[in-house]
């Protein structure tokens, strides 16, 4: 037997797959043009067609708070268990949370 690879995207076959009508690399421009402010709540929804600024699969589906901006990416603070994590995520992988 050969040892299975343990890359950054291992075990993401179902998590990072798109439905047939969603396929293609370009996300909706309305999602990219949203300007998030510090304190805004966002959902982390990974777009698997865009690899830049993609968070790890463990953060897919989590909700966090915008702290600031660094370059084109946003600094997002989330709670994972009893720890607070700081992530740098590009807007292609963020959705505004409805308050």
From Swiss-Prot:
Positions of transmembrane segments: none
Family matches, as InterPro entries: Ribosomal_eL21 (IPR001147), Ribosomal_eL21_arc (IPR022856), Ribosomal_eL21_CS (IPR018259), Ribosomal_eL21_sf (IPR036948), Translation_prot_SH3-like_sf (IPR008991)
GO MF term set: structural constituent of ribosome
One GO process term, biological-process aspect: translation
Listed Pfam families: Ribosomal_L21e (PF01157)
PROSITE patterns to which the protein is assigned, alphabetical: RIBOSOMAL_L21E
One of the record's GO cellular component terms: ribonucleoprotein complex
Domain of life the protein comes from: Archaea
UniProt entry keywords in alphabetical sequence: Ribonucleoprotein, Ribosomal protein
Disulfide bonds: none
HAMAP family in the cross-refs: Ribosomal_eL21
Similarity section: Belongs to the eukaryotic ribosomal protein eL21 family.
Name by which UniProt lists this protein: Large ribosomal subunit protein eL21
Gene: rpl21e
